[in-house]
Amino acid sequence: MTVTLTEKAEFRLRAFLRGSAKDANETTKGIRVSVKDGGCSGYEYLMDVTSQPQPDDLVTQQGSVLVYVDAKSAPLLEGIVIDFVEGLVESGFKFTNPNATSTCGCGKSFKVGDCSPEGVPCS
């Protein structure tokens, strides 16, 4: 499983994880990346902080950031590059997915061939 964090994304995630609330066991936290049906193109990216990955998650490490990938989402995320971009109007994580055949105008959702669910307009 190949998930790549750019230097900027790794820096931002490392700072975010360091500043997130500690759990009772002081467990090392990472990010869990997955996709769900949604958005105007069919699939939406999800990224959550977790210290308890799911048993079937695929685990990789980028710098000092643990990355857990949802096993069911893995085929849709193979080869993804996660970057952090800063702009005048909006800053945030940007996903470059080699499996996406198209993305919506806002860049928050994507389509993969003919297997994507029906999209709904972004709000």
Curated annotation (Swiss-Prot):
It comes from the Bacteria. GO terms for molecular function: 2 iron, 2 sulfur cluster binding; 4 iron, 4 sulfur cluster binding; iron ion binding. SUPFAM superfamilies: HesB-like domain. GO terms for biological process: iron-sulfur cluster assembly; nitrogen fixation. Pfam families: Fe-S_biosyn. Keywords: Nitrogen fixation. Belongs to the HesB/IscA family. May be required for efficient nitrogen fixation. NCBIfam families: iron-sulfur cluster assembly accessory protein. This is Protein HesB. It comes from Nostoc sp. (strain PCC 7120 / SAG 25.82 / UTEX 2576). The gene is hesB.
